[in-house]
Amino acid sequence: MTRSVWKGPFVDGYLLKKAEAASGSGRRDVIKIWSRRSTILPQFVGLTFGVYNGHKHVPVNVSEEMIGHKFGEFAPTRTYYGHAADKKSKRR
């Protein structure tokens, strides 16, 4: 079930302050965030965020196509190593 339209998108307050300060200063540093649940807003376009995946901060450069998605979608938390190989086919 999606979020109600009347509530608006969820963004942590500290995240708005950090993004506003970064865009005002003109510096292109990575903004470290832990809020994977926050929605990407139009004022974040062009900024680079370091989204924490439980192990490290994954750099995410925000583009126009990302607006409306969550930050956590772009920083995977699990490493996929592929499926295990079939032991029968290895012996041949």
Swiss-Prot record:
GO cellular component, one term: cytoplasm
One biological process term in Gene Ontology: ribosomal small subunit assembly
Transmembrane parts of this sequence: none
InterPro entries: Ribosomal_uS19, Ribosomal_uS19_bac-type, Ribosomal_uS19_CS, Ribosomal_uS19_SF
NCBIfam families in the record: rpsS_bact
Function noted in UniProt: Protein S19 forms a complex with S13 that binds strongly to the 16S ribosomal RNA.
Similarity section: Belongs to the universal ribosomal protein uS19 family.
HAMAP family, alphabetized: Ribosomal_uS19
Protein name according to UniProt: Small ribosomal subunit protein uS19
The organism of origin for this protein: Xanthobacter autotrophicus (strain ATCC BAA-1158 / Py2)
